[in-house]
Design a protein with these regions (language model features):
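Acidic, Ala/Val/Gly-enriched low-complexity intrinsically disordered segments
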Residues: 5-8, 14-18, 33
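Bacterial N-terminal signal peptides
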Residues: 41-50
Length: 374
């Protein structure tokens, strides 16, 4: 029951700490959700006879209410989706001319043909220098509580605007430069007008973020797991169902649940014992709250078999190693090789299929004599 005690202590800490009201509410809601998940887990486990081996019990059905199938899109209250906006966002996702040296686009680090990331511990910026964190996948990211490992952007729309201006990433000198590049091409001007009808001057940096965000809100990868959640009980094999039971019994569902199988909360890395060689402060660098030191957004496990290396620093190379370490450092459990293999078998069922037509690189407008370079 130590996890419940931890949740209650964390709740008391948040309640007595001076924090912005909206942020405090957000944290308390996360803690409440975590406690509800734990209560669900303990109720299920305590309901079984003490003489019944958990390995003999089909836990699959019992834990399914903690999950949701993927939607067809992730709506936003302040960014209405329309085809013109989505198509523009796709072009902007692949646009390099807004970067310094015209070398980089969103797709440089978040490659759509490799599940929205680049399989590198750290991604190189426009000068070839490596960043300080691994590039997370853009697939299914719109489902998440926030963006970036530390949650510093509240939405995919806001996230899209960050790397473009980051001197270590795409390196654009200013928002004005990006707007100037886009306005220099009549095809982009027409596309912005179609995407944002009624606006007198739609080519803005904020609308750049909204267009990319609209595109990303349909970057979803349904898998056999979704078919299973929708009622097709034959969608998963018996081994995959067994793997999910092991996943649930181990306690992984405490943080990895919902439509994203993660991505809905923050958690401390090294919850029950210090994570080895952890230098990144994580969430506390954003909130300036020492109580959130070493907290990171819980990653989604969708397509996890395709997105190695793992963690914010790409320090874990294989999925098997990642499963073992999560159990040990987050749940105080030592898994057998058989249990690790079983969980990995389930995780493989979370690999989805990107829409090849939707993610295909589009034709971009031609530069003009007025198109600036940085």
């Amino acid at each position: 029951m130590w996890l419940c005690d931890f949740s209650e202590k964390r709740k008391q800490t948040v309640e007595t700490t001076a924090l912005p009201p909206t942020y405090k509410i957000c944290l308390l809601n996360q803690i409440s959700a975590m406690k509800q998940n734990l209560a669900h887990i303990f109720a299920l486990l305590l309901g079984f006879s003490a003489t019944t081996a958990l390995a003999q019990v089909d836990l699959t059905e019992s834990f399914l209410p903690m999950f949701k199938a993927l939607p067809t899109e992730v709506p936003a209250p302040d960014n209405e989706l329309n085809d013109a906006k989505i198509n523009l966002g796709r072009q902007l996702y692949f646009e390099t001319r807004i970067s310094k040296g015209a070398k980089m686009s969103c797709n440089s680090c978040h490659k759509l043909d490799t599940f929205g990331q680049d399989n590198l511990p750290f991604s190189p910026g426009h000068e070839g220098k490596l960043g300080g964190r691994s590039s997370p996948s853009t697939y299914n990211a719109a489902l998440h509580i926030a963006q970036f490992w530390d949650g510093r952007a509240p939405s995919v729309e806001e996230q899209a605007k960050g790397p473009v201006l980051n001197p270590g990433e795409m390196g654009a000198p200013s928002e004005a430069f990006v707007v100037q590049v886009l306005k220099s091409m009549p095809e982009y001007v027409s596309a912005f007008k179609a995407a944002f009808p009624g606006e007198a001057d739609p080519v803005t940096y904020n609308n750049f973020g909204k267009a990319v965000g609209a595109f990303e809100r349909k970057l979803l990868t349904p898998s056999k797991w979704d078919d299973f959640l929708k009622g097709n009980k034959e969608a998963l094999s018996s081994e995959e169902k067994k793997g999910f039971a092991t996943f649930a019994k181990t306690g992984c569902v405490t943080c990895h649940n919902g439509a994203g199988v993660g991505g809905h909360m923050y958690q401390k890395l090294g919850l029950v014992k210090p994570w080895p060689s952890l230098k990144d402060n994580g969430r506390s660098d954003v909130t300036k709250n020492e109580g959130e030191k070493h907290f990171f957004k819980v990653p989604s496990l969708r397509n996890i078999t395709e997105t190695a290396p793992y963690l914010h620093d790409g320090s874990v190379k294989t999925l098997e190693e990642m499963v073992k370490m999560m159990a040990e450092y987050q749940l105080a459990k030592q898994l057998t090789d058989e249990e690790v293999t079983s969980i990995v078998t389930f995780l493989k069922a979370l690999k989805g299929t990107p829409d090849a037509e939707y993610t295909k690189a589009p034709k971009l407008p031609e530069s003009t004599s007025d198109t600036p370079k940085a």
